[in-house]
């Protein structure tokens, strides 16, 4: 038992001390000493609360230790980075943003470059000493608008930047912005989605988000011993939870996929444990949980998935999550199969989910074990093969049913790079998946804003007039 234990009915507490970094070795030692003292006292207070709570709380279903000290590791890797020309990036984004001018639908846009580059240092009292490179750069843009009925529409794209060579050209960026504007206009004129359960294809990147949201948080090991957790998969080890042609591996040691840099890559986790691949599902059967240094029944040690953002205590988190299929068809064949399913079920149409912005999933025991995902680009596909944009569609369902509805996969694996939030903060993640055909999925209407669009025309709708 230690101070990291979840108290029944309460959120996880953090025992972290922050301090400004001074110049000079002696000054740094004093600041570090003071911060350590504050953290120790906070942890002692937390342990007292845990001990008191343990006297009155009901017996835990899993009484595994709260923490097991990881083995000692010593590792140092220096990385020399080629500087990225920030003026070039600024000029690139300014020039690309001009493509938005004159568009009557756009109410707002953003063109952003972010970068985290350097080295991460890790020390613990057990003797672990680590220095590992971190290189996360990203160019992202977004354009958005709003219908008179309050419906919000958006499109965008992002590019992961790890070197000057990975910066997209102006021609590429402008072409993508123009494509996004065309999609935004199509969504503006598209009909509203209607509630329906029908066959659907989740395109590769969208399927990556689907796996991450629906399965990922439910197989994070530390959650399995939290009494307030829904435990969808806790007792499913060794059982079939999806079709036998599917496997899921989380492998944070993967730095690239098809020359695409993976944001979820790391060499050591935030508890000093070497990253390692973990087979979560093998041939449809649940095999493992993602583990940090907080053991659970049957999983006494970490498998290198303890992750956190600065100022948070690590818990088990995803890294690079990959859905692997042993039976694939071409994407064209997958669309033909979708149309056949629509006809077979007598549905007016099916769906192609091109893009997902994210969503949320309920994992607490007091709530239904459901999910809600927010597509940003959806097509209706009619029995004759005709496609039509539709807006305002949300995907809802439950994990066990949804995975059982997978019928087939394509051979078009692609990467979703993003950030994932949980109690240990926001961490970079990647998901790799092929496009997938679902026998059915439930679509419901998206909530709309109650406010009207602006009364005056947007400045974006006005042509460029120089710097006057």
Regions flagged by a language model, labelled:
Residues 225, 236-468:
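Dual-mode signal for accessory low-complexity, basic/Gly-rich regions
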């Amino acid at each position: 038992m230690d101070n990291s234990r979840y108290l029944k009915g309460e959120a996880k507490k953090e025992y972290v001390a922050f301090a400004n970094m001074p110049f000079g070795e002696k000054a740094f030692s004093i600041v570090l000493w003071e911060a350590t003292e504050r953290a120790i006292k906070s942890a002692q207070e937390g342990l007292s609360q845990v001990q008191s709570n343990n006297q009155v709380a009901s017996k835990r279903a899993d009484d595994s230790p709260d923490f097991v000290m990881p083995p000692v590791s010593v590792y140092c890797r220096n990385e020399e980075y080629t500087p990225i020309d920030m003026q070039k990036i600024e000029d690139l984004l300014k020039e690309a943003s001009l493509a938005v001018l004159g568009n009557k639908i756009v109410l707002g846009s953003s063109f952003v470059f972010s970068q985290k580059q350097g080295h991460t240092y890790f020390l613990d009292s057990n003797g672990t000493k680590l220095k590992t490179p971190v290189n996360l750069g990203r160019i992202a843009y977004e354009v958005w608008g709003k219908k008179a009925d309050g419906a919000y529409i958006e499109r965008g794209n992002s590019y992961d930047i790890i070197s000057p060579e990975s910066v997209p050209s102006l021609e590429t960026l402008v072409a993508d912005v123009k494509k996004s504007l065309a999609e935004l206009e199509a969504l503006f004129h598209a009909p509203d989605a209607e509630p329906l359960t029908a066959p659907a294809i989740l395109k590769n990147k969208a399927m990556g988000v689907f796996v991450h949201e629906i399965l990922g948080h439910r197989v994070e090991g530390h959650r399995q011993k939290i009494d307030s957790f829904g435990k969808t998969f806790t007792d499913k080890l060794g059982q079939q939870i999806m079709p036998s042609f599917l496997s899921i591996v989380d492998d944070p040691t993967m730095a690239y996929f098809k020359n695409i840099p993976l944001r979820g890559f790391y060499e050591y986790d935030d508890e000093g444990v070497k990253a390692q691949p973990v087979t979560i599902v093998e041939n449809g059967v649940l095999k493992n949980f993602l583990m940090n240094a907080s053991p659970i029944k049957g999983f006494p040690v970490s498998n290198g998935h303890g992750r956190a953002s600065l100022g948070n205590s690590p818990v088990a988190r995803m890294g690079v999550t990959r859905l692997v299929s042993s039976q694939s068809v071409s994407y064209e064949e997958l669309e033909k199969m979708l149309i056949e399913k629509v006809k077979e079920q007598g549905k007016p149409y099916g769906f192609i989910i091109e893009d997902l912005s994210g969503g949320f999933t309920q994992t607490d025991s007091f709530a239904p074990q459901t999910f809600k995902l927010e597509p940003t680009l959806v097509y209706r596909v009619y029995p004759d093969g005709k496609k039509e944009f539709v807006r305002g569609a949300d995907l809802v369902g439950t994990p066990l049913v949804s995975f059982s509805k997978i019928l087939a996969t394509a051979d078009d694996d692609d990467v979703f790079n993003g950030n994932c939030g949980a109690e240990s903060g926001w961490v970079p993640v990647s998901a790799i998946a092929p496009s997938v055909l679902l026998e059915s999925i439930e679509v419901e209407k998206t909530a709309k804003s109650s406010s009207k669009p602006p009364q005056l025309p947007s400045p974006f709708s006005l042509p460029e007039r120089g710097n006057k």
